[in-house]
Amino acid sequence: MPELPEVEVVRRGLHAHVVGKTIGAVRVHHPRAVRRHEAGPADLTARLLGARITGTDRRGKYLWLLLDGCDTALVVHLGMSGQMLLGAVPRAEHVRISALLDDGTVLSFADQRTFGGWMLADLLEVDGSILPRPVAHLARDPLDPRFDAAAVVKVLRRKHSEIKRQLLDQQVVSGIGNIYADEALWRAKVHGARIAATMTGRQLTAVLDAAAEVMRDALAQGGTSFDSLYVNVNGESGYFDRSLDAYGREGESCRRCGAVMRREKFMNRSSFYCPKCQPRPRL
């Protein structure tokens, strides 16, 4: 699933190319792609017709397009395999929605697995930020200029569950998924099974700092692409997968100490870690 860096790459691409454009005809090719828009496909297409895009924003793994003259936004969730693509004509297989812009560009939403989608949502003011209603419950993410690491540390010190589980909780800190949780924990030399409440404030701060650092590094390299499912708006893959220190490296040498990297099951996922740098906590 695209995580914060991948979604931010897409948002930046959209911001550069669609802000100031007016939406013309919109076609929903697969109704599942707008299933979260409760009023249905016809309502979404009618309300988007003639709307001018005035900006883009993001929180965690959600991005949205701001529309002129209304207090609603077009919210996009990429799900497992969603792609926002720009081109003269719909250019991808699995195109679920397409929108013609006034300069002739087609904005396409492609989604092989159909877990993502578009919806229109009301904008609300939450803690000094203007957010779409479906996003309002999400915590700030580590790349948010107003992210308060000290406040998050206070929350984590009350959590009697694994630190990795807390990193994946979008109401504690948003935008972090399995890949970047493993990468942050490796950089901070912390095993994901450590109970958050047993960690010091300094240790928890180090984990949050590592999460921000690794996501900035990934963003600089266009995100992480293991296959063709994640691409930017031009259909290009990111290349941070070549720089991963933990995720997917079972059986390889730790880049820091040389120990053999391990994998273990965690929440129907896999966790990758170094047994020497990140010793498992004692029960």
Curated annotation (Swiss-Prot):
Zinc finger (FPG-type): 245-279
Gene3D superfamilies linked to this entry: 1.10.8.50, MutM-like, N-terminal
Catalytic residues (UniProt): P2, E3, K61, R269
A Pfam family of this chain: zf-FPG_IleRS
Cofactor(s) this protein cannot do without: Zn(2+)
Family: Belongs to the FPG family.
Role: Involved in base excision repair of DNA damaged by oxidation or by mutagenic agents. Acts as a DNA glycosylase that recognizes and removes damaged bases. Has a preference for oxidized purines, such as 7,8-dihydro-8-oxoguanine (8-oxoG). Has AP (apurinic/apyrimidinic) lyase activity and introduces nicks in the DNA strand. Cleaves the DNA backbone by beta-delta elimination to generate a single-strand break at the site of the removed base with both 3'- and 5'-phosphates.
Protein name (record): Formamidopyrimidine-DNA glycosylase
Gene it is expressed from: mutM
